[in-house]
Every structure is written in structure tokens, then in C-alpha cells.
Amino acid sequence: IVYRVKLLRQRHDELVEQLRKRERDMEAAATARKYRKIAGICRLIKPKYEYTGEVYSIVVPSGVRDIMREGDALSHCVGKSDRYWERIEQQEAYILFLRKTAEIDKPYYTLEVEPNGTIRQKRTYFDRQNEDLKDAEQFLKEWQKVVSERLTESDREKAEKSKVLRLQEFEQLRQDDIR
């Protein structure tokens, strides 16, 4: 119950936000049921791909809900498209988070990464890549070297399949004249 008219708008906004969160939680639960392997895959890849540097860190999400929160926070398509869930489930690509180490819980960039550490996409707010990403390039190269040392033969085989699928997808986009 709202006793003061001036608080009505605030209370309305709070309730709308609660409803959005509840809807997103239900959507995350449905996606997690549909793609049951994702949480396990995230646990499995965490020791290989997670890495902390002085300025930047690579964080592995714990599952569907973390990925959806990242997409919502950065207002981009990760977490809204079955294509990403399918790629994770098939271990064709993984979604990882590039964060500033000092603000480890604050979304910065979302990465789509192949099993060998090849970065397919780097996106921040509104599917953009800003100039500030150049500051992280050296860190990302360092991270890729570390990941390369951690890979198993199975990871390398998955990476080869992933590369072929990526090239096929690019060719299909060219044929469809999608820019």
C-alpha cells in the first residue's frame, strides 16, 4: 500500500522491475531445462578458461542465468538467441566474460570463444566494440597463451570442428548477402 502520492511512481517502478526479474528468471529456468548440459559445461571449462590478471580478468559464467544477466546488463543479443545456447551445448563455442579485475562483478565485455581460445566475438553495450577494448588486447593475447597450455587433445579436436563450422557459417552469410 502506498500512503503518499509522491511515492506512487517509485513503487510502480519497483513492482515493474520485480515482474521483469521474475519473468527473466522463469525464462532462464526454461532455457536451462531445454539446454541441460550448459551448467555442467561451464563447471568443466572453468579451470581451463578462467584467468585473472592485474587489470583484467576472464570469468566463466556458472550457467544460463549468468549469461542472460550479462546480455541484459550490456543490452546485447547473448542470452536471447538459441544459436548461442546450441553452440555451448555442442561445445562449438563458449560464452565468457571479460571484466576489469577491480570491478569483477560489473559487466564489461562478453566474449564468444572457440575451444582453443580463438575469440569469435567481443561485445559490450548494444553489441558494440569500443576503443577501450584496445587496452585489453595484450591481456587477451596473454590469456590465449595460458589457455593454449591448458588444452587437452579433445579440446583441440573440438576447436578444429568449431573452426570448420565458423567458416561454413561465414560462407552461408556471404551467400545470403547478410552484412
PLM regions and their residue ranges:
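Catalytic-core elements of nucleic-acid end-processing and repair enzymes
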Residues: 1-179
